A protein has these predicted regions:
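Bacterial N-terminal signal peptides
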Residues: 8-18
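C-terminal capping alpha-helices of c-type cytochrome domains
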Residues: 67, 86-111
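Detector for the c-type heme attachment site
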Residues: 41-47, 101-105
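Sequence/structural segment immediately N-terminal to covalent heme-attachment motifs in c-type
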Residues: 24-44, 57-59, 109-111
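Gly/Gly-Pro-rich "capping" loops immediately C-terminal to redox-active cysteine motifs
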Residues: 31, 43-73, 82-87
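Conserved hydrophobic/aromatic "anchor" residues
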Residues: 34, 71, 99-100
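Positively charged n-region of N-terminal signal peptides that target proteins for export
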Residues: 1-5
């Protein structure tokens, strides 16, 4: 009996930690936010819609998060991105980075 409930406790905590991870990085929430705040310039697909904006599709999670936090803190400055980044929480930044990094891109190189 004791052993049984101990196992149950382990299973419950495993399930809980899996839920925490899922809540921590949520690409669907990231996509919804992209539609509200980023798509005009970077596209939902991460391919830039204005010439001065970079493509974000397939960029690594860590790079995207670092840049967004740098814009937010003022370490990196840009008249558009500094304004946008001010409105983002850590969780939103993680979700946005998760969305753009989840996009698969291919490169075609001229011979
Ligand atoms: C009004 C246009 C505009 C909007 C809206 C916008 N961006 Fe940007 N973004 C830019 C421009 C322009 C740059 C290039 C900044 C620079 O030259 O330093 C940039 C740069 C970035 C970079 C750095 C990329 C790199 O290669 O270093 C990231 C990451 C980024 N944007 C994410 C986002 C996210 C996420 C959103 C939505 C929350 C967003 N941007 C909304 C225009 C925009």
């Amino acid at each position: 009996m004791y052993r049984h409930s101990f196992l149950g406790l382990i299973m419950t905590s495993l399930a809980l930690s899996a839920m925490t991870v899922a809540a921590y990085a949520d690409p669907a929430a990231g996509k919804a936010l992209v539609k509200q705040k980023c798509q005009t310039c970077h596209g939902v697909d991460g391919i830039a819609k204005i010439p001065i904006a970079p493509h974000l599709a397939g960029e690594s999670q860590i790079y995207l998060e670092t840049q967004l936090k740098a814009f937010r803190s003022g370490k990196r400055e840009n008249e558009m991105m500094s304004v946008v980044a001010q409105t983002l929480t850590d969780e939103e930044i993680t979700n946005l980075a998760e969305w753009y990094s989840s996009i698969t891109i291919t490169a075609k190189v001229l011979e």
